[in-house]
């Protein structure tokens, strides 16, 4: 029996972190949740992570900075960014830099589920969700 793909969630807001974790588990994924980018980096779970969901605005290191650091270190983890602070310039840059999906909080669970499924399956996320 194959192991369920690991979805890593990096979110400083505990409510959103736990909500996303429950949603991913309900879809059959293995999850690890981290309160900060530093916590995720310290975990060293890069190679087993099938998809990373990261908040953009976090203390210490943003989700965009986390993604850039992972890429620089050779860890190309498909990444979904979430934010409560929409910024078209950041969205455009993130998608140009390879972010798989960009979602605004509060987002519909179905939008996140679609992004994760497409990312884990190796397909392109639906255009409306990025």
Regions found by a protein language model. Name each.
Residues 11:
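Conserved acidic carboxylate
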Residues 14-32:
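Two-component/phosphorelay signaling modules centered on CheY-like receiver
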Residues 33-51:
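Acidic, metal-coordinating helix/loop segments flanking the phosphotransfer/catalytic sites
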Residues 35-36, 62-65:
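Acidic catalytic/metal-coordinating carboxylates
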Residues 58:
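Receiver (REC) domain active-site loop signature in two-component systems and cognate sites
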Residues 65, 86-101:
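Alpha4 helix (beta4-alpha4-beta5 surface) of REC/receiver domains from two-component response regulators
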Residues 89, 107-116:
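C-terminal output helix
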């Amino acid at each position: 029996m194959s192991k369920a793909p690991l979805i890593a969630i990096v979110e400083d807001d505990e409510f959103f972190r736990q909500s996303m974790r429950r949603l991913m588990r309900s879809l059959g994924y293995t999850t690890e949740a981290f309160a900060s980018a530093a916590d995720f980096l310290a975990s060293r779970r890069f190679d087993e992570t099938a998809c990373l969901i990261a908040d953009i605005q976090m203390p210490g290191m943003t989700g965009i900075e986390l993604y850039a650091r992972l890429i620089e270190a050779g860890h190309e983890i498909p990444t979904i960014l979430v934010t409560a602070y929409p910024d078209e310039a950041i969205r455009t840059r993130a998608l140009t830099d390879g972010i798989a999906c960009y979602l605004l909080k509060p987002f519909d669970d179905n939008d996140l589920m679609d992004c994760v499924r497409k990312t884990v399956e190796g397909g392109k996320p639906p255009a409306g969700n990025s």
